[in-house]
């Protein structure tokens, strides 16, 4: 089964992709040319460049941020209660239909 993920960019333009379970939200975005998700550290949770907002309907389903992830997010001026690092959310069948809001890249 493929998992559908919808990415909504900072201009409110949405794009839905289908990917195999087991990849991160960040890796799925990067391999499908989704703009506004950077990957400075390659997805190892050391940079916060892949900061996204999880749609409120999906926050409980995506789990909670680890201590390391929370530490990186605490340095972000744009942090919200639904902020996550997209490299730390692994897609599964339970997340089929997930909606992610991306941030405009910093200059």
Swiss-Prot record:
**In this entry, which stretches build a coiled coil?**
none
The UniProt GO MF terms for this protein read:
2 iron, 2 sulfur cluster binding; electron transfer activity; metal ion binding
- By its UniProt entry, which Pfam families does this protein fall under? Fer2 (PF00111)
Report which superkingdom the organism of origin falls in: Bacteria
Q: Give the pathway.
A: Terpene metabolism; monoterpene degradation
**Entry's cofactor comment:** Binds 1 2Fe-2S cluster.
The residues that the entry says bind [2Fe-2S] cluster are 41, 47, 50, 87
Q: Which Gene3D superfamilies match?
A: 3.10.20.30
The biological processes this protein is annotated with in GO are: P450-containing electron transport chain
InterPro entries tied to this protein:
2Fe-2S_ferredoxin-like_sf (IPR036010), 2Fe-2S_ferredoxin-type (IPR001041), Adrenodoxin-like (IPR001055), Beta-grasp_dom_sf (IPR012675)
* Known cofactor(s): [2Fe-2S] cluster
What's in the keyword line of the UniProt record?
2Fe-2S, Electron transport, Iron, Iron-sulfur, Metal-binding, Transport
Tell me which family the UniProt entry assigns to this protein. Answer: Belongs to the adrenodoxin/putidaredoxin family.
Q: Could you identify this protein by its name?
A: 2Fe-2S ferredoxin CtmE
Encoding gene (name): ctmE
């Amino acid at each position: 089964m493929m998992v559908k993920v919808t990415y909504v960019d900072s201009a409110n333009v949405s794009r839905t992709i289908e990917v195999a379970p087991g990849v991160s939200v960040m890796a799925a975005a990067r391999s499908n040319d989704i703009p506004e998700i950077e990957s400075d550290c390659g997805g190892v949770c050391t940079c916060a460049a892949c900061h996204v907002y999880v749609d409120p309907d999906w926050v409980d389903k995506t789990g909670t941020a680890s201590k390391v992830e929370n530490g990186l997010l605490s340095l972000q001026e744009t942090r919200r209660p639904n902020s996550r690092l997209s490299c730390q959310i692994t897609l599964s069948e339970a997340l089929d239909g997930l909606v992610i809001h991306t941030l405009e890249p910093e200059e």
